[in-house]
């Protein structure tokens, strides 16, 4: 029987191997969506990822003979420990062939890392922060992945459960029908709610007009989710990074902002056209030709993804979503959108799930993080 050898990623050559491993593993899987290689590389650069300023991280590759058969990253988020009192090793970027010797060796590496730092718990898959991809797929293996969700084969959860890991957090995802005509009560309520609470939908003529609202959006995101047990506030440095990286290419028609009579933001939603098929065609590289597929996906698409939604706690359950959906419908009516897919939502987050009730929600994916208490 061949031994599994674990090696730490110590140079860029090995980092490229680390990034490309799942692309090879899932090369014949029509539902896997590869990331952009340069974006993945930037995750591990301090100048590109502000979370590295308060986190420790290592990456490892698993080998059998000279062949790569698995990978894992381990992370300690010191901000999480200091602000929430949560002391754990996060593990992520977990991929492996269907061989329990490989998955065992990878998890043992995470345990070893935790023990070296006197930490008694590991949890994953997850990234550095709440805005990173998290959760191992447990339902929906036959559904096309999104650019904001992890994908894995059905054997992954079985491997972790056989190793003694247990469910920590559960996420659900929904597919919503984007109606040709909004439900009558939504049309009616949107006007009534706007009038009652003196709310308005902000109109943007260009991307430049959106930028002053980016920071308020993230602050509102904190207000929306701060009651959740695992939520850590977004730092100003993270906001700056996300603003520079993403808001430059998001179509203004996919951003909806609702403000009160004092022009204070009370709700927002960011949707994006599905870039899954464009990413599959890109095969990890945007240039020289793949940018064209992204351009086309933005112009005409039958599917969009809810990327972020934030509603101030004072306005949750007050019908503000009717204003948001009416605005989204108006903005996207000529883009061919038929389905909206939500991002992963914690199962416990009923305040967000109730938002979809008027749009025939289908729970088509589930995912979870697994944890293990480490014995001394």
What positions do the PLM features span?
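Catalytic cores of nucleotide-enabled group-transfer and carboxylate-activating enzymes in metabolic
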Residues: 12-15, 34-46, 53-62, 67-74, ...
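Generic, well-ordered alpha-helical scaffold segments in large soluble proteins
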Residues: 21, 109, 113, 220-224, ...
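A conserved beta-strand-loop-helix scaffold within acyl/acetyltransferase catalytic domains
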Residues: 22-64, 72-82, 203-204, 208-309
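A structural motif corresponding to the C-terminal lobe/cap of the Radical SAM core domain
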Residues: 358, 362-369, 373
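Acyl-donor binding region in acyl/amide transferases
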Residues: 83-164, 282-358
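Short beta-strand segments
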Residues: 123, 175, 257, 270, ...
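Acyltransferase donor/substrate-recognition loop-hinge adjacent to the catalytic core
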Residues: 2-4, 150-230
